[in-house]
């Protein structure tokens, strides 16, 4: 499955548009990891604990979107948009939403 944020893929012809596909992931951060992330992992303005959760959530959302695209008969998703949000009453969850257009492509 090819994925791109652009509306086309260089070297390929889009032969069929199959519809919008989405993928979402909401991950609750471990409360103890949250508590100590600022102390233990915060180096140079970055938190390894949060970055790992972000990568995990993004992979889940991409897998969900690609699985839906495959079920439609697509071999690529174009025009992908990725949104990140912190949600929950105490901002304790991370949400990643991904969407794009499932297409059938062929090499030129």
Curated annotation (Swiss-Prot):
Q: Which HAMAP family does the entry mention?
A: UPF0145
Family to which this protein belongs = Belongs to the UPF0145 family.
Read off the NCBIfam families from this record.
PRK02877.1
Q: What is this protein called?
A: UPF0145 protein HDEF_1024
């Amino acid at each position: 499955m090819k994925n791109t944020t652009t509306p086309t893929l260089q070297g390929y012809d889009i032969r069929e548009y199959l519809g919008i596909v989405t993928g979402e992931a909401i991950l609750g951060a471990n409360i103890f990891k949250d508590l100590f992330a600022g102390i233990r992992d915060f180096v140079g303005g970055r938190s390894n604990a949060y970055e790992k959760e972000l990568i995990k959530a993004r992979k889940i959302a991409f897998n969900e979107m690609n699985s839906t695209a495959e079920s439609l008969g697509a071999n690529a998703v174009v025009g992908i948009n990725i949104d990140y949000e912190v949600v929950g009453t105490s901002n304790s969850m991370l949400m990643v939403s991904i969407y794009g257009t499932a297409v059938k492509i062929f090499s030129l």
